[in-house]
Amino acid sequence: INPYLAFETLGALSDLPAEKVRANYIKAVGKGMLKVMSKMGISTFQSYCGAQIFDGIGLSSSLVERYFTGTATMIEGVDLDEIAAETTERHQRAYANENARLDTGGAYAWRAEGEAHAWSPNTVANLQHAVRGNLPDKYRAFAAGVNDQSRRLLTIRGLFEFKPAGVAIPLEEVEPASEIVKRFTTGAMSFGSISREAHTTLAIAMNRMGGKSNTGEGGEERDRFKPLPNGDSMRSAIKQVASGRFGVTTEYLVNADEVQIKIAQGAKPGEGGQLPGHKVDRHIASVRHSTPGVGLISPPPHHDIYSIEDLAQLVFDLKNVNETARVSVKLVSEVGVGTVAAGVVKARADHVTISGYEGGTGASPLTSLTHAGSPWEIGLAETQQTLVLNRLRGRVAVQADGGLRTGRDVAVAAMLGADEFGFATAPLIAAGCIMMRKCHLNTCPVGIATQDPVLRARFTGAPEHVINYFFFIAEELREIMASIGIRRVEEMIGRTDLLDTRTVVEHWKARGIDLSRLLYAPRTAQGVARFNSERQDHGLANVFDRDLIAAAEPALNRGTPVHIERDVRNVHRSVGTMLSGQVARRFGHEGLPQDSIFVRLKGTAGQSFGAFLAHGVTLELSGDGNDYVGKGLSGGRVIVRQPESANRDPAQNIVVGNTVLYGAIAGEAYFEGVAGERFAVRNSGAVAVVEGAGDHCCEYMTGGVVCVLGPVGRNFAAGMSGGIAYVLDEDGTFESRCNMAMVSLEPVVEEEMLSEREYGHGGDLETSGLVEIMSNLGSGDADRLKALIA
């Protein structure tokens, strides 16, 4: 590709030499392409070429078949004639004889006479007046402005009209607002991205109503787990588990009514969450178990999810930690999401969120805001159709999320298949947000998206404001339901027959729009569920930990140390996880004294051995482990060593699989042998010793100590922003395998030979060299590591 016009234009605009301008442009475009490839999971340029990694929205089938062959499209729209007409119009405007005013713009922030926004100063003012004064008339003015889509055509749902299901009924016969609001949740906005004041205001409001607030991916302060003296609760009912696993402790998980696995975010699909360093103060860093002042970036994927089977394992892990909580999976709206949602249900998730591109835009990159994601209407309709066709719909609750604002939006979402409804921007506006678009700068003037104590003091929101907003929505929904003859929300879920497209669309480009694929209702046998009506069977009745919990009762009830010996097989997954959930529920993150529950096992453990292991629980395995050993380690101790009968060199033998200690918070892990890839990825505080590791060791690590007494693979320490890693570099080639973007290598300042001897847990770890300890470490890390290994 030769972008000659870009080269010539930039050369004319810049005083730099032409070669420099071209080099800068190529570098910028290359970075952009790499970003897109990363978001879409593409590793090579050849795979990028012809990948058609986009959906067609509002293009006619004939146009797509001819010019974008193979591209998926759910909504019919413009053909070549309309495109040609618009191109001609633009050309005429550009080369008209008279001087024309430049467009006002306003693609990002609202401007008068600029691009239309759903949130304008008028709608923001109407909503805030309504909720602060509890003024229904002001809310009606707000809703009327937002719902007026016939003129502005801002959303797909604006093209729908409601059809009556029967004769209108009195409002008194409709489900009360107090029940409807229990279907509402607030979006996943992390503590860190928004202030404590804003975060707790949302939580208190939702808890009072019986709805649910969402922590986002930044953890939650422990003091919020206990009710306030007046009976209110600041505890978020939904605890999110994102790819960064920030703040995901066992205690965090047991204090949840729902645990949400964030696969992606509607506003920026394919990207991990990011928190700029200037928003990571000491308090935020403490909650997230990271370093103050250092920006935090979640990996684009979950490194323990590369298939539906892996997702099923994570669902199983989380249900073992907290078997009373629902497990949710958050997906992004796109063509094909229905197939993914079916897999999620088969992985035994209890809840699926379909996230649209309109929401979550506070700090998303501009390119993602304008070019990524798709409307929730598309993904929700496909999800409903796919789940109903496969008789899976009754097993899962489906939530629509991303840009919901009014009761009309809720009604359309329900008819397209949603059981529940997520709101984020609108509740923040009810609490005082004025859409300054400064969320990423830490300069929010109303104290919401900032950690600056001076700005936080300006926060004037209250739980009552958020509660008023949600009750206004519920009352608007009730009025719609009464007008079309519906008594209960579940009666309208999946009822696309109650939606009709507008017969007159006041825009010349919209004449070819066809929404029939969104409104398709699968033909199914009578009795096939259209909404969530049953509970998933998670297979927890006979898990291995039931026996461990029974044997550990003296420690759990009286604090008496216990020693348990069992054989284990690879069908025994998540060993120690349910036991740790019991410890955390009773004793919090501190758990029990070390080795209070000592479990000695023999055999081959299944996936997620020692996942979320709580303080006071020690698992010693004589044998080997599979993937995800010590995932989310929360203070416990994991030891994996070769069987006594083994006749092999542990430095040459893989003893545990991939992604070991993913998201570990605290605790210790010792492995007599080699680990697979991504050892200690996102380690936040655990201390680990291993005799070798594969590629990507210590990736995204923010704390803790890792000692590798053997060779490692490539890309060591990629994205590592905290913690210390020691690597035995016998052949002097380690530097070539280390990613130096964020770390530096230091030779040993002072050496101390550690004799090879048993360290108290069953044998030598190091058989081929000497461990070197730096003498100038802070916080006693050197002494601690010596003691652990020795």
Roles of regions detected by a PLM:
Residues 218-220, 332, 596-599:
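Long, charged, glycine-rich C-terminal linkers/tails
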